[in-house]
Regions:
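Active-site beta->alpha loop and helix N-cap motifs at the rims of alpha/beta catalytic domains
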Residues: 2-102
Length: 102
């Protein structure tokens, strides 16, 4: 596991389009806003990110998108585990790491 930087980590919400799809253009704007304003990291994909309204695939795609747009500028932290089964939670968290979470 990587060492996470100390500092400011806002909780990132998940913006949705009018037809209830993840709004990737708005996510890109949030990443740019956080980077431009000196955040050290983003707490992406957590309870405040509406993870219970996202499928595992959507969470992984979102984490991957955030990581690409971030391009290493800030640390990325995610919980993103919604399963009731511990083994499944481990798999969900591994997928978050595989898609850019630290």
């Amino acid at each position: 596991m990587k060492q996470i930087r100390n500092g400011i980590y806002p909780t990132m919400i998940t913006p949705f389009t009018d037809d209830n799809h993840v709004d990737y253009a708005a996510i890109e704007q949030l990443v740019e806003y956080y980077a431009a304003n000196g955040c050290d990291g983003i707490f992406a994909l957590c309870l405040s990110s509406e993870i219970f309204h996202l499928s595992d695939k959507e969470m992984q795609q979102m984490m991957n998108f955030i990581a690409k747009k971030n391009n290493g500028r800030m640390s990325l932290v995610a919980s993103g585990h919604t399963s009731l089964n511990v083994d499944a939670q481990i798999e969900q968290l591994k997928a978050m790491c595989d898609n850019g979470a630290e």
